[in-house]
Regions:
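C-terminal motif of bacterial Sec signal peptides marking the signal peptidase cleavage site
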Residues: 17-20
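Bacterial signal peptide processing site
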Residues: 22-25
């Protein structure tokens, strides 16, 4: 009766020892990764600026800053997709002249100018406040002040 138990135990032990000797350890390898993204639907320039500010808040939890991946235009509004990318340790701050109107033609240009103004104001201990205007000829301008 004892030999009936010993034989299966011996075979199992031998199998485990051989498997341990012949196999090498493999660690999982990352084959793809992506940064967190957030998408906002908006109508108009003021909502785009608010979507950008919301993306800043969202990306802060990852110690990152938003980068515009794409802006899609549709019949029912526009959609902006932001990717959270690691914040640079050294940032070049472009000089923004407060209360000077900056013309822009595209949503991307508006976001770029807005981010530059925010960096400038933050470097000077404030926060950027934007005012968007559209002239009768359709020219769009944004003016910043630091508060």
């Amino acid at each position: 009766m004892k030999s009936a138990y010993i034989l299966p135990v011996a075979v199992t032990a031998a199998t485990l020892m051989l498997a341990g000797c012949g196999s090498s350890r493999h660690e999982p390898q990352a084959v793809a990764a992506s940064n967190p993204t957030v998408t906002y639907k908006y109508h108009g320039d003021q909502e785009l600026l608010q979507a950008n500010q919301n993306a800043v808040t969202y990306c802060n939890q990852y110690k990152a800053v938003p980068r515009t991946v794409r802006i899609d235009r549709g019949d029912e509004g526009r959609v902006a997709v932001f990717e959270c990318v690691p914040a640079a340790t050294i940032t070049t701050v472009q000089t923004i002249n407060p209360n000077t109107p900056y013309p822009y033609r595209t949503d991307e240009e508006l976001l770029d100018t807005s981010r530059s103004a925010q960096r400038y104001c933050t470097a000077h201990g404030g926060e950027a406040v934007e005012t968007v205007t559209t002239a009768p000829d359709g020219t769009r301008n944004v003016t910043y002040s630091c508060r």
